[in-house]
Amino acid sequence: MAFQGTSRTLTQQSSAATSDDLQKILFSPEAIKKMATECDLGRHHWMRADNAISVRPLVPEVTHSRIASFFKSGYDVGELCSKGYMSVPQVLCAVTRTVSTDAEGSLRIYLADLGDKELSPIDGQCVSLHNHDLPALVSFQPTYDCPMETVGNRKRCFAVVIERHGYIGYTGTTASVCSNWQARFSSKNNNYTHIAAGKTLVLPFNRLAEQTKPSAVARLLKSQLNNIESSQYLLTNAKINQNARSESEELNVESPPAAIGSSSASRSEAFRPQVVNGL
């Protein structure tokens, strides 16, 4: 016979007071600070030689204990159907290098379950990035919800594990990893479709690409030169007839050659100066 009951959300299963208590646990100033300092949520984590292996839980220990206690108290009195689960739809990591491309080294990044002593990658979701591949975006999708329990002396939850390999001679920071995720907590759990870990290589940012127009410094110099010329040649009750000079002549910068047949080859169009280091 098919199930005829109704599925209730966490808010419906618990009273308004307990729901507010859960909100305070998750979004209190202390909890937000712990998420930043202990989990590096949205912060840049530096991979150094003295920190070759980094294990960052997705929930701080204090917050984990309070959430587990909240669900357990509701479960013990029959208000909740379980002792609570942690759900993370996706973990996204932005990885950038902080050394030159010829440095020989790599990073191994994966999602693990702290309930596993071996800290093995969940469902084989693991990504290796060589130094010359960076920058890159990496994503992980757990296939199950993690019970809010304690295993031995470990608070069980998902964790991002980063391993640094190689980089001989580089003792400082060789890569920066910024991880983002959104943890959810519920009294019900589920299993999810297995999706391989995602790895997207990103083109390095070309910061000179947008420098196609004169900078503020160039415009200021041009305006100052024009003001000086005007004060020297201004005659009372006389018509001003000055030969306008192009910006490239005033700044003594050669203009790039115009493409043959393009509109920029027209004599009536003003020359555009080359941009060098922001000028």
UniProtKB/Swiss-Prot annotation:
UniProt biased composition (Low complexity): 254-268
Record key words, sorted: Host cell junction, Transport, Viral movement protein
UniProt-annotated location(s): Host cell junction, Host plasmodesma
InterPro entries: MPV
Domain of life: Viruses
GO cellular component terms listed in the entry, alphabetical order: host cell plasmodesma
Job of this protein: Transports viral genome to neighboring plant cells directly through plasmosdesmata, without any budding. The movement protein allows efficient cell to cell propagation, by bypassing the host cell wall barrier. Acts by forming a tubular structure at the host plasmodesmata, enlarging it enough to allow free passage of virion capsids.
Name of this protein: Movement protein
The species this protein was found in: Cucumber mosaic virus (strain CS) (CMV)
